Amino acid sequence: VDKRVIFAVAGAGKTTYIVNRLSRGKRSLIITYTNANYNNLRKKIIDKFNGEWPENIELMKYFSFLYKFCYRPFLSDRVKAKGIIYEPNSNIYLKESDSEYYITPNRYLYSNRLAKLLIKMQVVDLLKERLIKYFDEFIIDEVQDLAGRDFELLEHLMTVKMDTLFVGDFYQHTYDTSRDGNFYKKLFDNKSSYEKRYVDREIIPDNYTLTKSYRCSPQVCEYVKSNLGIDIGSHRERKSDSTIEL
């Protein structure tokens, strides 16, 4: 079983890397967060397979994965939700043991607490079995955008006995999929402690494969490395007359 998290730099070609490893002989589930990256992945996968979408590959946006793959098979009959609402619960006095903590009065699940509901209802082991049943590898692109309750669920799923690949840029953490008060508030304060969360669950960190950028010039990479402490190189050739204006 190959279990890795690749820490990529900006413009390193992480989407291309993921697509290049896909084949018709392996059942792959790919999860991504933003619409832009979903569309980019979809286009590149179709291009790779000569204009066709291979039946053995499933590409899902994160909340579709949570709702359709994780929630529906195990909890739809018990919870009877109508869908997801993408705004926080305004009632700060509810406890995790209250059903209203997770769902609105008109039966819409709070997106930032759906992952927590799956954990609370003890379906994580069933999710792992479902992943293994339908897929040979589990891939998450933009993994740096999973935070809060969603990262808590990811920590549970990290231990699934199958090939897993997580790819992301720690320093491009932009979105918080499940901001929920102070829960995991300091998750991205320190890269070493963030990386350790993967290591503790036997995920091998890879800080080498995607550390050169196609987007940034050597001069820009040197500036970022010197001033921000980010280990980034460039695939581009140095131009002697290049300057950086600040």
Summary of predicted features, one role per range:
Residues 1-246:
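The feature marks helicase ATPase cores and/or their adjacent C-terminal helical subdomains
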